[in-house]
Amino acid sequence: MNTSHYSVLGHAVPYPKAYDPSLLFPISRAVGRAQIGIGVVLPFVGEDRWHAYELSWLDARGKPCVATATFHVPCDSPYLIESKSLKLYLNSFSAEVFNRAEALRLRIAADLSACAGAAVAVEFGLPPVGGGDKEISLDRLNVDIEDYGPPNPDYLSNVAQNLIEEMVEETLTSTLFKSNCPVTGQPDWASVTVRYFGVPIDHEGLLRYFISFRHHAEFHEQCVERIFQDVLQRCSPQCLAVEARYTRRGGLDINPLRTTSEMAWPISVFRDPRQ
């Protein structure tokens, strides 16, 4: 089984001069999920949406072409794709000739699907930069913070647990999220959004919980699944969606989304202003 310790992540490697799909490195999702009590039956649906900003190849006349692209990796794939390996793989197309851009798109889709162990959708272009109109920013809260890790789900609670609770639908977001790469220790910055329907969640507690990831080392996808599990278990919403929009590194950004139901949450896809 592949682990991140055997990948190119954290190692100096030469940039490829020719197309090489073997550069792609899969990491089993099962290992990280076992640590937070997720087994074979997943409590969520969703995807890891990648935005690629540095994609280039040669046309039939040898002229360089450039494009951006979006990749959709389903969360029920057995493997996630390690980010540095994806960067190197995409760079390996820089001297590869394609008569049509569609041929490149199909090649990338086939290679990423083989790496992830499930069908990966690939499209040229990026979502627009934007934001949710009804989002409530937690960053405005005037709170004292002293806990920066490990992630502490004890901060999560409902506002009124012993009263007749009224159900609400809220979209809560924070740009203050930071975690760290488990291999290199590099900081990973993100905007995190929690959308739910249920008994009101305590806003200050949720912000403190987000900030308790600040010294935590875990892959982007695993952080989002940990947040999903903790909020679901501690606050018991009837519907829940968690998405993190991580800032760009190496020409890529990662946007994991986990939700209780595809039908319950029509997702408005956009890029964060920091991406």
Curated annotation (Swiss-Prot):
Quaternary structure and partners:
Homodimer.
GO terms for cellular component: cytoplasm
Question: What Enzyme Commission number(s) apply to this enzyme?
Answer: 1.7.1.13
- Top-level enzyme category: oxidoreductase
Q: What is this protein called?
A: NADPH-dependent 7-cyano-7-deazaguanine reductase
Function, as annotated = Catalyzes the NADPH-dependent reduction of 7-cyano-7-deazaguanine (preQ0) to 7-aminomethyl-7-deazaguanine (preQ1).
Keyword list (alphabetical) reads: Cytoplasm, NADP, Oxidoreductase, Queuosine biosynthesis
Q: Where does substrate bind?
A: I81, E82, S83, H220, E221
Instruction: Tell me the Gene Ontology biological-process terms attached to this UniProt entry.
Output: queuosine biosynthetic process; tRNA modification
What is annotated as the active site? C181 (thioimide intermediate), D188 (proton donor)
Q: Where in the cell is it found?
A: Cytoplasm
Cite a single GO MF annotation.
preQ1 synthase activity
Q: Could you tell me the superkingdom of the organism this chain comes from? A: Bacteria
The Swiss-Prot or TrEMBL record describes its family as follows:
Belongs to the GTP cyclohydrolase I family. QueF type 2 subfamily.
> Per its UniProt record, what InterPro entries does this chain match?
GTP-CH-I_C/QueF, NADPH_dep_7-cyano-7-deazaG_red, QueF, QueF_N, QueF_type2
Question: Catalysed reaction per UniProt?
Answer: 7-aminomethyl-7-carbaguanine + 2 NADP(+) = 7-cyano-7-deazaguanine + 2 NADPH + 3 H(+)
Organism of provenance: Xylella fastidiosa (strain 9a5c)
Pathway participation: tRNA modification; tRNA-queuosine biosynthesis
Give the residues the record marks as binding NADPH.
S83, K84, R249, G250
